[in-house]
Amino acid sequence: MRKGDHKIKKLKGKDVDALKMLGRTGHVQKDVLKDYTGISENRINTLKNLDYLREVYDNNSDDKYLRLTKEGRDFVHEQLGVVCYKSNAPVHDSQIVEYYMHMTKEEQDSWKTETELHQIIKDDLGRDDVSPTDFSYVSGGEVIYVEIITSNYSNGQIEEKIEFVEAMGGTYEEIRI
């Protein structure tokens, strides 16, 4: 079978879980994806052969990650309604994955990516000058906005994230790596 020759005819529950996780979090290590969602090696290979997934290496380590291709992101958006996260870097995204795995299904289903948050503030508040957080979710009726802070963030960038959360009316949480 050549890449892109056919599409998935039927999504299984494990496929949906894996594709949503990849769409929401960016880069995921293969073993983590398999352990968390139960997706099989064969199914991962099928998704790679269909050009929905590809393996990438972290430039700073020998770690290998899976991520959605453009075709995969389009498929996840069209079929599952997930606005896919624009990945930064595997190490950054691995912190998002770690957070995601400790959430309830309801919290995961309330997940909004940075792309969605940017569109919301643009549409609802008419602002395009605020930098949204990496993601948000609802827990106990409260909207939590989470930002993964790396060593190259300036104080100004962090303030922009806080300003965004204040404009949206939620709770700000940051994770420093």
Where would I find each of the regions flagged by the language model?
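Conserved catalytic cores of phosphodiester-cleaving nucleases, focusing on short active-site segments
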Residues: 99, 103, 119-154
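Hydrophobic, Leu/Ile/Phe/Ala-enriched alpha-helical segments that form helix-helix packing faces
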Residues: 47-48, 99-107, 162-166
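Catalytic cores of nucleic-acid endonucleases
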Residues: 143, 148-177
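Nuclease-adjacent, charged terminal/linker segments that flank catalytic cores
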Residues: 1-83
